[in-house]
Amino acid sequence: MAFWAMTVVIAPVVGPVLGGYITEEYSWHWIFYINVPIGLFCAYSIATLLKGRESKTTKQPIDIIGLTLLVIGVGSLQFMLEHANDLGWFESHEVIILTIFAVVGLVLLTIWEWYERNAVVDLHLLRSRNFAIGVSLQTIGFTIFFGNMVVMPLWLQTVMGYDSFHSGLAVAPVAVFSVLFSPVIGMNMHKVDLRYLVITGFALFAFGSWYSSLLTPDATMSDIMIGRFLFGLGIPFFFIPLGALIMEGLHGEELTHAAGLSNFLRTLGGAIGTAVFVTLWTRRTIFHHARLTENAVPGTPAYDQLMNQLGHAGMNSTQRYTLLDGLISQQAATQSTLDILYLTGVLFLVMIIFVFFAKPVKGASATGGH
């Protein structure tokens, strides 16, 4: 479980750093080309290392209807989330149509899978209280987590002037604590109630979010990296105990179905978090830009002082207004970023309340089915 948590976290952290380096030194095309040798190597490794270890297979009827509804519902949702911000969300007919397809497809999928004997998605796992609570916390928590993670590179590249490599480098410390302490937590979580570990994770996420929400456009890379490191303190307390809590009381094929469903919902949560928080960041930037512009008018002390200073520096009116708009845009994007970081911190604290709905369980009993 600890090793799994490290791979889950390291990938999205190393990705921006490596991707940024490749983009800066070569071209963005190589971000895709590099997957070809990696994919071939992984395929060869799996075929070689797992040879002779095939799982027991049985012939089962394929849930064609359920699979079709899953593709329609989730496919429409993913496509809508990916393009909604560019299309103006529900001002676009395409987004509305995709939303209808997603809602209808997922509702019909839920109804069908509940009564289907050979369901492609085993919804009966939700009868397990800890699975239902745990997978909900994981999905919503990962949505907030990704929202927090995605706005920082946006701010660094649009306001702070970082290139893609250095913005990835600035957020990389988020994984340091996870790599070092995930094995420690994995080996010792049988000693405490898993719920308290999850609560610790949410509390640390909230603290790291709050710290980063105090940054300014004058922040150094060290300031940013410290904030990301503090945020990363919560990662091993979140992923590992929550994964064990989800699997508590499940056995045999239930574990396979539970792992598949929880991984799918976690990925979906990340996609939702990216789409929603990028849109929120954009709209809050527009909001703050409008508010700041309202106060940047002749007659206000700050405006008059700045215009006089720029005039004495030899700038004409066009240059002065261009510089002023740039300063307003910088402050608006910064304030929008800080708003989202603060919001995610509050949401993480709210998540703590729902942890108590899960049944008390220690790590030893939770992992007994593995």
Where are these regions (language model features)?
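Transmembrane core module of solute transporters
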Residues: A2-A5, Y26-C42, I65-L67, Q78-F79, ...
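Hydrophobic/small/kink-forming positions within alpha-helical transmembrane segments
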Residues: V9, V13, V71, V176-L180, ...
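Conserved kink/hinge residues within transmembrane alpha-helices of Major Facilitator Superfamily
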Residues: P16, S182-G186, V355
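Hydrophobic transmembrane architecture of multi-pass small-molecule transporters
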Residues: F41, R266-P360, A366-H370
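Helix-loop junctions on the cytosolic side of multi-pass membrane transporters
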Residues: Y44-P61, I111-V120, P217, F287, ...
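Short, hydrophobic transmembrane alpha-helix segments
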Residues: H83-W89
